[in-house]
Amino acid sequence: MALQPASGARDLLPRDVGVNRWIAEQLAAVYQRWGYEEVTPPSLERIDTLEAGGAIQSHQVVQVVADEALGLRPEMTASIARAACTRLAAMQRPLRLHYRGSTFQAQRAEDQGLRIVEDLQSGVELMGAKGLAGDAELLRLLLDAGSHLPLSAEHQPTLLIGHQRLLSVLLEAVEPSLRSTVRRHVCGLNRVALSQLELPGQQRLQLLQLLQLRGEPAAVLNGLEALLGATDLLAELKQLISIIEEQASRAGIRLQLDPTFHPDFELYDGVMVKLVCQGLDAPVAIASGGRYDALVQRFSPVGAVASGVGFSFAVEAVRQLLEQADQLPPRLDGQLVLVAYSQSSQLHPALNLLEQLHQSGQPAELWPEPCANQDEAQGIATQRGVQTVRWVG
């Protein structure tokens, strides 16, 4: 009999579960203040829904043996977009939804078998808010949610902002047969490979300059304007930054504009964001998202104007980040009381006392064996991390 969990799986212990719940509740309270309602999409979906029209690769989906092609969701957005365009199609837009739940990703290493990585997520989806207004609400909400987590200056929280169309505009001048290769090298920040491609000199120079454009938004926008000229896209990005920069400063979150930013899933066709913090050894991404109008369009009636934008927090990553910095919240079940008794005949009154404490809202637990005296009971309580003993003698 196997005594270890499956490859990629983890046992969550009571403290882990309690902190995860606390983090998710802090985030949900923020979402609800912004008018978002909670939904729970199914863990199982049809493969064509999960693959989101090619945005997610089939090897990333944990497939389930069934009469039809089913899989476990690798992310939440596709399932919620499907529900929004079918079960919730009659509801007035914009539609504001939030969720919490586990996602499952299939990962394969060259010399290893399949690993199934389960991750707890908390996030929002905003359907029917097009353009700048939807993007601005999403980023303001993300900053608000991030500010309600106990992150410190040592975490150096940074919000990376990119846009799918930025790189596409630059790639329009590239020979079509080379575009996917150039995109891969640019997103991978591979200067050497980019320099070796058969590209016109000015075009290569512009792409190499693009690799340097990453950092403070105003400076990056100026650099992009020098490369692209004044465009509506840059004007919209400039306006978006102006809407969020003051709130980001108050929240202690640095803004970084990165034209080469490319997320793991190719869901996005507009603005893209990732909230990154400094861990003990390396940066840790705790939230990500963006605009996915094409995905919503896929689930919508032909000819309908559809739009969607959203983000999700990786709850486990947040918990581990707080654990490393010793910034976890105090015991989350209140000040627990231990009820102890002296002999077997006192079990009944001890349980009655336990019930009274529970009815008054006091967390309490019963020690199941008789104790010789109160000192023994207090010693047991101390070992269990409990300060208060209620004695039935």
Curated annotation (Swiss-Prot):
Pathway: Amino-acid biosynthesis; L-histidine biosynthesis; L-histidine from 5-phospho-alpha-D-ribose 1-diphosphate: step 1/9
UniProt keywords, alphabetically: Amino-acid biosynthesis, Cytoplasm, Histidine biosynthesis
GO MF: histidine-tRNA ligase activity
GO-annotated cellular components: cytoplasm
Pfam family, one: tRNA-synt_His
UniProt key word Cytoplasm: yes
Leftover remarks: This function is generally fulfilled by the C-terminal part of HisG, which is missing in some bacteria such as this one.
Functional summary from the UniProt entry: Required for the first step of histidine biosynthesis. May allow the feedback regulation of ATP phosphoribosyltransferase activity by histidine.
Subunit: Heteromultimer composed of HisG and HisZ subunits.
Protein's UniProt name: ATP phosphoribosyltransferase regulatory subunit
Species whose genome carries this gene: Synechococcus sp. (strain RCC307)
